[in-house]
Amino acid sequence: ELPEKNFAVAHALRTRRNALSGCGWHLEPGDGSALAQEAAQRLKSDLDATGMLHPELGRIESFPGLLRDLSDAILPGFSAAEIVWRPGGRGFYGFRPIEQRFFSFAKSYTPRLRTTGHLYDGEEIAHGKIIFHELCDGGDPVRGGLIRPLCWLHCFSQLNMKDRLSFIERYGMPFV
């Protein structure tokens, strides 16, 4: 909600996201072999074909849409998207963003997906199913974003001293 309430934050965030998603991208093969060249070309054609409205799966994001969605990690510190695979493992349709609230870090700094059977702890994420992007260098991914310092900045710029002290006293927030 912070970008909705503070136009300067919204403007800076939009500028950064547009700069990231506006950059060009290309794939390079891992080595000079014909097999690596073919794999890189096949992946590029798969990425170019992503993004559509699937009748059963709903809206599927394209690769530039994935890059834009993963830039959501700027504020909360992490972002994730599901890879929507084609049947039989022959390529993929595209990507579907997953909101941050569906992840749990209760047991460790490794993300776990919250499901109906595992609401608090979450369950382990299957390999090759989710792309997870985090901004922090080790440590807690939830604290890696810009949301905490921006919340303090917003609080100090919008509330007078009396209201801030009243809020801190009422909700027991330590003043750090």
Annotate the PLM regions.
Residues 1-22:
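N-terminal-proximal low-complexity accessory segments that begin disordered
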Residues 18, 29-30, 35-176:
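Structured, contiguous alpha/beta core segments that scaffold functional sites
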